């Protein structure tokens, strides 16, 4: 990304149509990812169209049915373009479930295949970004901790917030991803709104935890 920013007129290098076709062959980049992989013309054609849209700067709308392999069809030209030009590329997904699939399954598999095919290439990495309500707000959590664990009545039973608070604090201390969806908290005990913030509530640079 810095390379493009410092020289905005620098020409970009894109994978060729032949490289895309080879990637989706049985012996290619994608073919080596899956056992008993069968090349699909629809997947290859979609990937080529994505590559062409990158190169021309045009918009592209694709409609493809289930089983085509849409994610890998756009990830391959995206990854090759990002690697060769040392840039960051964003992918917006409709659901968080699809985002998690890309982050934890598709991209790591593709990154491994790229390392095998070209050990000297820059490693492919990714970072997920979700909405405010998916990440712990340290300012709000400090307030919850300062107030101490309270008792909550859940289905006629008095339950303490302490175990949920302990799990949350341990999660924050030990993880880098920090997406609380993976923690599976009982939000009846510890409501999401008291441990996360919103775009309206976030203090940004004025927050005492800014940069943490």
What annotation goes with each model-predicted range?
Residues 2-33, 86-88, 92-212:
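A substrate-engagement module of RecA-like helicase motors
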Residues 14-62:
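Conserved pre-motif I regulatory segment
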Residues 38-39, 65-70, 200-207:
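Short, flexible loop segments at the rims of nucleotide/cofactor-binding pockets, characterized by
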Residues 39-42, 46, 70-71, 99, ...:
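Phosphate/oxyanion-binding active-site loops and adjacent basic polyanion-contact surfaces
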Residues 51-52, 72-85, 105-109:
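Walker A/P-loop NTP-binding motif
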Residues 56-60, 84-90:
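Short, surface-exposed connector motifs at secondary-structure boundaries
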Residues 56-77:
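Walker A/P-loop
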Residues 59-61, 81, 212:
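A compositional/structural signature marking long, glycine- and acidic/polar-rich segments
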């Amino acid at each position: 990304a810095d390379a493009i920013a410092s020289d905005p007129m620098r020409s970009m290098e894109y994978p060729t149509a032949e490289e895309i076709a080879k990637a989706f062959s049985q012996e290619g980049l994608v073919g080596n990812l899956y056992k008993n992989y069968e090349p699909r013309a629809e997947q290859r054609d979609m990937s080529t169209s994505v590559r062409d849209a990158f190169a021309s700067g045009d918009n592209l709308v694709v409609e493809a049915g289930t089983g085509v392999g849409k994610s890998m069809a756009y990830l391959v030209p995206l990854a090759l373009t990002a690697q060769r030009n040392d840039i960051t590329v964003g992918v917006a997904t409709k659901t968080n479930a699809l985002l998690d699939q890309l982050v934890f399954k598709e991209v790591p598999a593709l990154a491994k295949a790229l390392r095998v095919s070209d050990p000297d290439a820059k490693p492919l990495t990714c970072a997920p970004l979700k909405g405010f309500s998916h990440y712990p707000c340290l300012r709000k959590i400090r307030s919850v901790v300062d107030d101490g664990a309270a008792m909550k009545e859940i289905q006629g039973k008095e339950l303490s917030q302490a175990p949920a608070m302990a799990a949350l604090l341990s999660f924050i201390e030990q993880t880098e991803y920090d997406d609380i969806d993976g923690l599976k908290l009982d939000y009846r005990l510890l409501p999401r709104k008291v441990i996360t913030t919103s775009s309206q509530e976030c203090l940004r640079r004025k927050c005492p935890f800014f940069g943490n």
